[in-house]
């Protein structure tokens, strides 16, 4: 067999893998464009989060083991691990008086719950979904979409896991009454139309979700939220993708620590992957496919460590730079560093700052970051997985 024949076979296999994965995970008629770059290693290597649980055929009987697999700043997140299972049996929603069997009824409870789904469903929420502390929303084993209405709000709570669901076409919430616990219904002034908005919360993990086409952002982490890990997600077809930090004047965001790892920032994304203010962002082993404006940006002196990412620049000559500082000057001392990153199609990263940028991870938070050339394999299954209850998740 000639070298040319082997190369052709590799191209065909990679294309098939990408298209099948997109279809299996319900990318709603949109097939992600496969970049014209072959992965630089085989397709059988998993990242540290996935290797912790995905190959176990008994995952459905031991769902809560997932909580042991989070890495990075959100590694202490328990979700509903210490609670009972709650099964969503129907997609119907009532913002003020949710009924048993609905998603909203589960997420507002005061006790820990691990929430699963009895069947495939599309949930269109009446108003924003207020998630209480110690909850896991676990979509494995079903195709679950939250779409075409307001979406998820995580506000002033702790220990929330959102895993394996698709969140897209989110709309602004309405002014009105929304229940946030069994004993409290409060006035809401209307949400912005984010897929997931995280306010003043800690120990949050967003993993293996599909996020696209919302009115405002896909993920916002603001108001001094910290202890956040955003991993294994597939982002596509959106403008302002991920905001970390409320505004330049909100000094409390200096405590914010966020890990962004093993995500696939796919086609049709414009900017903010992420955009950071004041806090610390570890951006590691992510794949970026042809952003339109920039990939990683920020203002107000954030610390950004870009490690082992795989950047494929747009074909446009004015969109090659990975980074963007949202000020005209004074950013030379901001600590923005790159290590082990791979740059394709003319992509480049402009570093800045002096002194150490060592990761402030505890031993429990620390994980191995691979060289950037391995990222196409490590992110190949970003987004919701195809999980059969009687076998491993693919």
From Swiss-Prot:
Record text on cofactor binding: Binds 1 Ca(2+) ion. Required for its activity.
Active site: 272
GO molecular function (one): pectate lyase activity
GO terms, biological process: pectin catabolic process
SUPFAM superfamilies listed in its UniProt record: Pectin lyase-like
Signal peptide extent: 1-22
Domain of life per record: Eukaryota
Listed Pfam families: Pectate_lyase_4
Cofactor(s) it depends on: Ca(2+)
Enzyme Commission code(s) on record: 4.2.2.2
Residues noted as binding Ca(2+) in the record, renumbered to the chain: 192, 216, 220
Protein family membership: Belongs to the polysaccharide lyase 1 family.
Name the UniProt record assigns to this protein: Probable pectate lyase 16
Organism: Arabidopsis thaliana
């Amino acid at each position: 067999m000639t070298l040319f024949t082997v190369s052709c076979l590799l191209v065909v296999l990679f294309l098939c893998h990408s298209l099948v994965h997109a279809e299996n995970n319900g990318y709603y008629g949109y097939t992600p464009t496969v970049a014209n770059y072959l992965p630089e290693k085989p397709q059988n290597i998993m990242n540290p989060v996935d290797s912790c649980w995905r190959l176990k055929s008994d995952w459905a009987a031991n769902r809560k083991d997932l909580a042991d697999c989070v890495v990075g700043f959100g590694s202490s997140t328990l979700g509903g691990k210490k609670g009972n299972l709650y099964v969503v049996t129907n997609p119907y929603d009532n913002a003020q008086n949710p009924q048993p069997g609905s998603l909203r009824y589960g997420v507002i409870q005061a006790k820990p719950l691990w929430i699963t789904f009895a069947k495939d469903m599309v949930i269109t929420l009446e108003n924003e979904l207020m998630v209480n502390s110690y909850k896991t929303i676990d979509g494995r084993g079903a195709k679950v979409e939250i779409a075409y209405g307001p979406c998820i709000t995580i506000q002033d709570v702790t220990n929330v896991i959102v895993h394996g669901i698709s969140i897209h076409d989110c709309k602004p919430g309405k002014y009105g009454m929304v229940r946030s616990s069994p004993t409290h219904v409060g006035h809401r002034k209307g949400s912005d139309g984010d897929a997931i908005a995280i306010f003043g919360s800690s120990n949050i993990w967003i993993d293996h979700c599909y996020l696209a086409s919302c009115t405002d952002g896909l993920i916002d982490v603001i108001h001094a939220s910290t202890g956040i890990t955003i991993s294994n997600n597939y982002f596509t077809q959106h403008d302002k993708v991920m905001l970390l930090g409320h505004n330049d004047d909100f000094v409390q965001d200096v405590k914010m620590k966020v890990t962004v790892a093993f995500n696939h920032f796919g086609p049709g994304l414009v900017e903010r992957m992420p955009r950071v203010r004041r806090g610390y962002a570890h951006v590691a082993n992510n794949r970026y496919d042809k952003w339109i404006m920039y990939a990683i940006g920020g203002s107000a002196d954030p610390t950004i460590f870009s490690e082992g990412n795989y950047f494929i620049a747009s074909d446009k000559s004015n969109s090659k730079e990975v980074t963007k500082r949202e000020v005209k000057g004074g950013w030379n001392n901001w600590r923005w560093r790159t290590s082990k990153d791979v740059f394709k199609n003319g992509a480049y990263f402009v570093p800045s700052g002096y002194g150490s940028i060592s990761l402030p991870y505890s031993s429990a938070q620390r994980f191995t970051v691979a060289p950037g050339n391995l990222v196409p394999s490590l992110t190949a299954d970003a987004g919701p997985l195809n999980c059969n209850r009687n076998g491993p998740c693919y």
